[in-house]
Design a protein with these regions (language model features):
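Non-catalytic signal-transmission and effector/linker regions of two-component phosphorelay proteins
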Residues: 1-66, 131-138, 142-223
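Conserved phosphotransfer microenvironments
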Residues: 9-10, 36-52, 60-63, 67-114, ...
């Protein structure tokens, strides 16, 4: 694992917090079989855990989730609900329309991030990685930990906001270089929790509400390569 930190800006006083993190993920479409949905319920409700993570890390406006059972149902939902910001799909070998759905969305010019979760095995990894033109943005190994969902959300928010927040404003960036699905699926949640907790510690040094919001939004971006 290699991490590269860009230079820290000396002063954010001239940057208003509203200009940072302009893109936020507010609504997530979850594609998940009844069985996997049941397992997630057994592990703990994802929505509740993500909400608790947001509250625990002093983060506002947690996203809402829309649950469907198949790629076909997802297509219908996307037609009826144009405000979907992200799609997270639990890999299901029976549902053969998942990869065509992701590819079709990209072909239609829709820039909705499409993330695939899988219970890691070499056989499944080989099948997934063979879909080179699938339209899937990232593949993650699922261990039943809601921290990973939070990390995925923040990863794509950081990616969309990087050009302005980093290049124009001077926000720091941490580059995680890792090609192992299992490793980056483990590293990212821990890295985000560390960064967000440190940001909350820095809030104690601020003097007013605007300074707090500025520091909160100017936390280092995390990019995965």
């Amino acid at each position: 694992m290699i991490m590269q930190v860009m230079p820290r800006p000396e002063d954010f006083r001239n940057t208003h917090f509203s200009s940072l993190i302009k893109f936020r993920i507010k609504r997530i479409l979850m594609i998940c079989s009844n069985y996997d949905a049941f397992i997630m319920e057994e592990d703990g409700k994802i929505e509740s855990q993500v909400y608790k993570e947001y509250v625990g890390l002093n983060m506002s406006n947690p996203p809402t989730f829309v649950w469907v059972e198949s790629a076909a149902a997802a297509r219908q939902t996307l037609e009826n609900e144009p405000d979907i910001d992200m799609i997270i799909c639990m890999y299901n070998e029976i549902d053969r329309d998942i990869f065509p759905l992701a590819a079709d969305l990209k072909a239609e010019g829709k820039q909705i991030p499409f993330v695939l979760l899988m219970h890691y095995s070499k056989q499944i990894r080989k099948k997934v990685m063979s879909q080179t033109d699938s339209g899937v943005d990232f593949v993650f190994s699922w261990h039943g930990n809601a921290d990973l969902i939070l990390a995925i959300i923040k990863l794509f928010e950081d990616k969309r906001n990087a050009d302005y927040d980093i290049l124009e404003t001077g926000v720091q960036a941490i580059m995680l270089v890792e090609d192992s699905i299992r490793y980056y699926s483990t590293y990212l949640p821990e890295l985000y929790k560390l960064i967000l907790k440190q940001s909350n510690e820095f809030l104690k040094e601020t003097l007013n509400e605007d300074q707090q919001k500025n520091r909160k939004r100017s936390r280092p971006k995390i990019l995965l390569a």
